[in-house]
Amino acid sequence: MTISSARTARRLPDLTSSAFLVIAFLTGIAGALQLPTLSLFLSTEVQVRPFMVGLFYTGSAVIGIVVSQILATYSDRQGDRKTLILQCCLLGALACLLYAWNRNYFVLLFIGVLLSSFGSTANPQLFALAREHADRTGRGAAMFSSVMRAQISLSWVIGPPVAFALALGFGFPAMYLTAAVVFVLCGLLVWLLLPSMPKTRVKSAATLESPRQNRRDTLLLFTACTLMWTCNGIYLINMPLYLVNELRLPEKLAGVMMGTAAGLEIPVMLLAGYLTSRLGKRLLMRLAVIAGLIFYTGLTLLNGSWALLALQLLNAIFIGILAGMGMLYFQDLMPGQAGAATTLFTNTTRVGWIISGSLAGIVAEVWSYHAGFVIAIAMLAGAAVCMWRIRDV
């Protein structure tokens, strides 16, 4: 009996860690089924102009920041992240049901986006819970986080091609219903498998160190990550419409490009997690900026299908390092506040969507989808300035 109990105890951490990986994959799938086709959905199903498409992304980001910041503050001070993640998954499923059958732009913008914001917040909360679990069990936080990020990338290998196949072959309702089922399954696994870690009040200065000591570096990192995510947002908004309307390439190519980049991100994330102790997060983030500059320059110069696919290696390096190392960089600068640090990093994505939504819509309306990539190059130059001024930690 004693031997059996000991063996079970040894297996439990592995089961829990595996559950984190599976749930990270499912939350990634839920997002990867919706985001790649959103601009196409708004322009063809809801039938709005490019400016309104950009406005939708901007409004979505603003609401998302408010929701995630409120939940992050609550989760860092009290409550149980497990319950919060479960509730977010169920609200995400409700959002998918609304998108499946409603075609009123403003209903989608306000009610749909509010529900979706809760759904998307499940992901940063999952990573915050994983960080706490890794710290408690003695696992390497950097490598464990990189493996979880790799699950997100794996979901994006599968999600975008499936999303375009469902949307173009069976209609957008089928695509959104599939995403709703994934959210429900994710919530079920959270309820059954994730550990509960209720908050306890700890007043140790070592564990609750104020991030104000690193205010300058946190601000520089926030600015750099925001600019980098803005470029990615412009790419994700413009790219499907750019391929179809300006390059006259097949719609499904967008899904293939996204899936290819996501597949290449997996080894990039794992390698970055392995190298972080040797090279440091700052150097890796600088490499990401350089890869991004070359990638967006290539987008402005090349227009063949195979050339665009080949460029995805640079895109994978850019996003793979940013997604994996950026969050850990914030957590290092804000010790004892895993939820706030993780959500602050997530909010760089959302602020990026605010900027990219506005820019992508206006630039496409006034000039072209192609011009958005030129603006991305200038933004990456600004991100490079920030990354070359920030200190290593």
Swiss-Prot record:
The membrane-spanning stretches of this chain are: 22-42, 51-71, 82-102, 107-127, 152-172, 174-194, 219-239, 253-273, 287-307, 308-328, 344-364, 366-386
> What membrane topology term does the record carry?
Multi-pass membrane protein
For this protein, the record's Gene3D superfamilies field holds: MFS general substrate transporter like domains (1.20.1250.20)
Checking Pfam families in the record gives: MFS_1
GO function term, MF aspect, one: carbohydrate:proton symporter activity
The uppermost taxa in this organism's lineage are: Bacteria, Pseudomonadati, Pseudomonadota, Gammaproteobacteria, Enterobacterales
**Physiological role:** Involved in the efflux of sugars. The physiological role may be the reduction of the intracellular concentration of toxic sugars or sugar metabolites. Transports IPTG, lactose and arabinose.
| Gene Ontology BP terms | cellular response to glucose-phosphate stress; D-glucose transmembrane transport; lactose transport
Question: Can you say what this protein is called?
Answer: Sugar efflux transporter A
**CC per GO annotation:** plasma membrane
Similarity section: Belongs to the major facilitator superfamily. Set transporter family.
Name the encoding gene, please: sotA
Induction / repression: Activated by cyclic AMP receptor protein (CRP).
Q: Kindly state which keywords UniProt assigns to this record, in alphabetical order.
A: Cell inner membrane, Cell membrane, Membrane, Sugar transport, Transmembrane, Transmembrane helix, Transport
| Location within or outside the cell | Cell inner membrane
- InterPro entries xref list: MFS (IPR011701), MFS_dom (IPR020846), MFS_trans_sf (IPR036259), Sugar_efflux (IPR004750)
